[in-house]
Amino acid sequence: MNPVAAHGLARTVSIALHPFVVFAALTLLATWMLDREALPRVVAGLAVAIGVVWVFVWQRVSSGRWGTVDASRPHERPLLYAVVLVVVVGLWAWLGMASPLARGVAAAGTMLALAGLLNRWIKLSLHMASLAFAGAAAWPLSPWLGAASLALLPLLGWSRLHLRRHAWPEVVGGTVLGALAGMATW
């Protein structure tokens, strides 16, 4: 594959498997399987959560404070983690502790908090963490969707490395953290 095509494919994979997309798909699957009546409430909460984070990211990039929407430089990440954690806590409160989704939201929030704490030493791939989390968390709900998510990890890992967003330890570390956090939802 020529370099231009490889870069285009890597970028497409990175966008298609972005944490927003992955977490939205997992949340919709979990809601459909566990609490269909909550679907309108969950969709509204999810839309607000993604919207708030996306507006924040867009503002950082458009102002020139960040180079990419991925917050690829380690110094860009602490504020991103803070905003995302506030949004996750808000979503958790919106859904309610009694919601069947509460454990998953708490596990995802814990995963992001750990990644944020570790950011001082390693910039874990949130793309990899999100997809590994989704694969592990989806497994009990739909084994074939869980397996499909996990099967996409090598392609996403290649994408993140090819785009030079991460080094191997960051890709592997994000994957391990995500898988462990996803298993905590069982």
PLM regions: where:
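Membrane-embedded catalytic cores of phosphoryl/pyrophosphoryl-handling enzymes
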Residues: 101-186
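Hydrophobic core of alpha-helical transmembrane segments in multi-pass integral membrane proteins
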Residues: 25-28, 46-59, 81-93, 151-154, ...
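Alpha-helical transmembrane segments of integral membrane proteins
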Residues: 10, 14, 40-48, 80-84, ...
